[in-house]
A protein has these predicted regions:
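Charged phosphate-binding loop/patch that engages nucleotide di/tri-phosphates or the phosphate backbone
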Residues: 159-179
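Aromatic- and glycine-enriched beta-alpha-beta binding-site module
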Residues: 49-83
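N-terminal strand-loop-strand
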Residues: 28-63
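Acidic, metal-coordinating catalytic segment for phosphate/diphosphate chemistry
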Residues: 3-39
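Unchanged
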Residues: 69-162
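Short low-complexity stretches enriched in small and charged residues
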Residues: 7, 40, 79-83, 169-170
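Glycine-rich, flexible loop/turn motifs
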Residues: 23, 32, 57-59, 64, ...
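Phosphate-binding glycine-rich loops and adjacent basic patches that engage nucleotide phosphates
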Residues: 2-3, 37-48, 117, 128-136
Length: 179
């Protein structure tokens, strides 16, 4: 069982567990209110840098991740998305357990010519380690750049204030606590 690191994670865990009990479609985008997603905080082997992608939709440097789309193995989703969005070949979990939890608000937007209403992402984050020597490439339909940042620079690079303060800083604190 996941042990929350703070009040935010404890509340979000309770929301997620309640949502799972009440919704059979929690892992699909067919649930327009909320659905599960998986993200990765990708670090190099010395854990001094994090890999970020310039997200086209949010117009911000961001972690990697995506929708579960029916898959309940969220670690597999996080790994798949990390590889797809960055071109990484050598990437693996630091450990298989959940690293962080977040309930994230997504504004209404257009995707592939279709309106997507405001909804929540019930997000599970995994800590991944990658070979900083791997060639990186963007995934043009989702991002337009991928690069390594020093941990604190990764936070500063994001223009999403809420993500900086509530997610990326928390992830860096947790990485540093690992030693």
């Amino acid at each position: 069982a996941y042990h929350p690191c703070c009040e935010q994670e404890a509340v979000d865990r309770d929301v997620m567990l309640h949502f799972l009990r009440e919704n059979t479609d929690a892992f699909t985008r067919e649930n327009l209110v909320a659905h599960f997603t998986a993200s990765s905080w990708i670090v190099n082997s010395s854990r001094t840098h994090a890999l970020m992608a310039w997200h086209n939709l949010y117009r911000a440097w961001s972690w990697t991740g995506g929708h579960a789309d029916g898959e309940t193995d969220l670690l597999s989703v996080a790994l798949r998305e990390a590889r797809e969005e960055t071109g990484l070949v050598h990437v693996a979990p630091v450990f298989p357990e959940i690293f962080s939890l977040e309930t994230l608000w997504v504004e209404g937007h257009e995707k592939r010519g279709k309106y997507v209403p405001c909804h929540l992402h019930l997000n599970v984050t995994y800590l991944l380690e990658a070979d900083a020597g791997d060639a990186l490439r963007a995934k043009p339909d989702e991002n337009s750049g991928v690069r390594w940042f020093m941990l604190d620079e990764a936070v500063e690079a994001s223009t999403e204030e809420w993500m900086r303060a509530r997610v990326y800083e928390k992830l860096n604190r947790k990485v540093r606590a690992l030693g």
